Amino acid sequence: MKNICILGATGSIGTQTLEVIREEKENLKLYAASANKSSEKIISIIEEFEPKYVSMTDKEAFLKVKEFCMKNNKNTEVLYGIEGMNTIASLDKVDIVLTSVVGMIGLEPTLKAIRNKKDIALANKETLVVAGEIIKKEAHENKVNILPVDSEHGAIFQCLLGNLKGDINKIHLTASGGPFRGKKREELENVTVEQALKHPNWNMGKKISIDSATLMNKGLEVIEAHFLFDVDYEDIEVVVHPESIIHSMVEYKDGSVIAQLASPDMKLPIQYALNYPIRKDRVIEKLNLFEIEKLTFYKPDLKTFKCLDLAYRAGKIGGMMPTILNSSNEYAVELFLNKKIGFLEIPKIIEECMKKFYTKEEQSVEKIIHMDKIIGEYIREKYN
């Protein structure tokens, strides 16, 4: 039995992780969970899964959940704030921590978990984007597995099994193209939030849905792949694959290309990461190749979807630049979701911040947190 801690248990990935745990009660146990404001959802989780600990980052939600547990004689301990997240991520009895919180808030508890020798099922790609070198170093020193919880990196991970790193020629990172695939820049001038949230293939949260529409999600995944698999940026190629059946491919020096195919369902990479290195019975719809009939591939349009190009540039510059890219994107997406800016202003704000805040300083956790803070203050003051 594996004891699971989910950071971000009420979001899209967290909810699908609970579905996997529900299917595998004999193998997986929800030991701890965190959420922000979703007190009603956490209460439902407490009633069904009976975790030993939950943590809420919102004070009002914390008090509501705590009151519920006291009134109903629940044995779940309720914690509060980032300190609560750090605590549940490093509990002795936790075997693996699934980090599915959105954004920079995942950095500190992920590091706490690694330093307490917990394997990480990583759905919070921002953590690796902003602190890739730090995370890699800490994971190596503490002999911790970083298991990717997304379809693309989970696919690459599997395509690399049994092969030598030195034999890799190229990683082909697939992208659906998002809801605006094939459109030109001028067609995106008046895109609405509602249109941008309608992803053709995947069921995701709001922030990642907007990132998928701008192709920033793929850009962040390029940086993530660089750190996860120690592959140069020149050897990571994004391939637009609208069907989302091939989740990524690895090309080897002898010309062989190994691909991982499956129905587009996040429960598969979640299940694989939680049970690694064992494969369990299928929790997703079986892939029927005869129904698919054809698979198509295109080059990404970097002029229309500038965020992908910006991500490559930030990754190659390195240092603090991926932090600047990520933070400016987070705040720009927040403005777009709140209808304060247009869709095409997202890459403009990111590029502006990459120029304004560029520094040759090396990474540290403190510098990353400070950079995120000053970028947030700058963007909110200028654009609100």
From Swiss-Prot:
Cofactor: Mg(2+); Mn(2+)
The protein, known as: 1-deoxy-D-xylulose 5-phosphate reductoisomerase
Keyword terms: Isoprene biosynthesis, Manganese, Metal-binding, NADP, Oxidoreductase
BP-aspect Gene Ontology terms: isopentenyl diphosphate biosynthetic process, methylerythritol 4-phosphate pathway involved in terpenoid biosynthetic process
A GO term for molecular function: manganese ion binding
Species annotation: Clostridium tetani (strain Massachusetts / E88)
Annotated positions binding Mn(2+): D150, E152, E221
Annotated EC: 1.1.1.267
Keyword presence, NADP: yes
Entry binding sites for NADPH: T10, G11, S12, I13, K37, N124, E126, G205
Positions of 1-deoxy-D-xylulose 5-phosphate binding: K125, S151, E152, S176, H199, S212, N217, K218, E221
Pathway: Isoprenoid biosynthesis; isopentenyl diphosphate biosynthesis via DXP pathway; isopentenyl diphosphate from 1-deoxy-D-xylulose 5-phosphate: step 1/6
InterPro entries linked: DXP_reductoisomerase, DXP_reductoisomerase_C, DXP_reductoisomerase_N, DXPR_C, DXPR_C_sf, NAD(P)-bd_dom_sf
Family from the record: Belongs to the DXR family.
Function, as annotated: Catalyzes the NADPH-dependent rearrangement and reduction of 1-deoxy-D-xylulose-5-phosphate (DXP) to 2-C-methyl-D-erythritol 4-phosphate (MEP).
Reactions it catalyzes: 2-C-methyl-D-erythritol 4-phosphate + NADP(+) = 1-deoxy-D-xylulose 5-phosphate + NADPH + H(+)
Gene that produces this protein: dxr
Keyword Metal-binding: yes
Pfam family name, one: DXP_reductoisom
